[in-house]
Amino acid sequence: MTNSTPIRSTHFDAIVIGSGPGGEGAAMGLTKANLNVAIIEREPSVGGGCTHWGTIPSKALRHAVSRIIEFNSNPLYCKNNTSLHSTFSDILGHAKSVIDKQTRMRQGFYDRNQCSLIFGEASFVEKNTVAVTAKDGSIETYTADKFIIATGSRPYRPEGINFNHSRVYDSDSILSLKHDPRHIIIYGAGVIGSEYASIFRGLGVKVDLVNTRDRLLSFLDNEMSDALSYHFWNSGIVTRNDENFEHIEANDDGVIMHLESGKKMKADCILFANGRTGNTDKLNLSAVGLEADSRGQLKVNDNYQTDVEHIYAVGDVIGYPSLASAAYDQGRFTAQAITKGKAEARLIDHIPTGIYTIPEISSVGKTEQELTAAKVPYEVGRSSFKHLARAQIAGKDIGSLKILFHRETKEILGIHCFGERAAEIIHIGQAIMEQKGEANTIEYFVNTTFNYPTMAEAYRVAALNGLNRLF
């Protein structure tokens, strides 16, 4: 057992299980309200899956690959027919350095706020008691008045696949890839699968992307999904839609995937990225009268309370939206519920989505298909990045911004962006969308002055384009 500050007692006002974004948000909120708080983390360092296997490393890898692509496509550098080549193992070092920085920073949060850190696997013993099993096998028990379960999720591993084989990976173990594949199969074309397809293809690896649905990222606006499909095709990624695996053969020299349709695919290795499950199986929930669903998730009310009054849950372990940003907010709201009797805030209605493929995608609000189904009289304003001076200067002219707005009230209903820095660009429009009443209007972008040249100017161009469609 290791702790950031000396543990004053084995009893705490609150114990948070898990130090990912949800656990961190809850712990910080509770300690700032002067509660005696402990946080239990099963891994050797804080940060949770987001920091060590999920959001941070995958985005760091994506950034490194993007810079390689930029170097190789820039006429300033490639005029001598020289190009920069890196392997997956080469760029893992960049991800590791970012993870280390994030871990040190988050460790500092707990140190400054005198939050006790306990390292080990937590499981409930009875209503107000948890046992923590350390790496050396020793067991300590702790009691608390309140508990917050923030244990996150892990990749779904179906039976019949040998994930211990050196050629078979999930989205956690892929960060321990020991060889440099020339050809990879990625099963699952959701956000994680699509992001890794971009990363590997950017490194020159042949990618077969197997999608269990009829289109890529079907929750997106159709134009965004179509744009991603085109760019994947244009980059050389082979996408197989509407396919399900039957079984996987893993050999010393590669893998063969057999599909239910009768097709067979062969590659050096496979990344299985189809679904996630909540980390609740080792918590011994039955000891406190709780039961997770088939996906390992817990039900909570508006205050993030489970069916057991003094036990709360946040983050991936409660399902949608399963975003690091939302989990942190849920943790803060839970701290409010515990200290003030009620969560004073809740997640916003329109949570932005950021997908770090190459190119990037981000959206907030309604899609065209949703507005059409609801018979909302909307209009569309578009801006192509290739017409923006800043994009031309930066050589980032692939992409577009689309604003959906009500024809009569001019209220912004949805914003969809495809291209470099899309996840940053989206927040400009989101800020206006969140305004109340008449303040949410597409006319804002026409009546304000933007810096020039900027990518933000896409909003002015799209707004003018959309307003010119009205009659």
From Swiss-Prot:
Top-level taxon in the UniProt lineage: Bacteria
Binding site for FAD: 41-50
Localization (cell): Cytoplasm
E.C. code: 1.6.1.1
Pfam families, sorted: Pyr_redox_2 (PF07992), Pyr_redox_dim (PF02852)
Catalytic reactions of this protein: NAD(+) + NADPH = NADH + NADP(+)
Presence of keyword Nucleotide-binding: no
Cofactor names: FAD
Cofactor binding description: Binds 1 FAD per subunit.
Single annotated GO MF: dihydrolipoyl dehydrogenase (NADH) activity
HAMAP family: SthA (MF_00247)
Membership in a protein family: Belongs to the class-I pyridine nucleotide-disulfide oxidoreductase family.
Name of protein: Soluble pyridine nucleotide transhydrogenase
Species: Aliivibrio fischeri (strain ATCC 700601 / ES114)
Gene: sthA
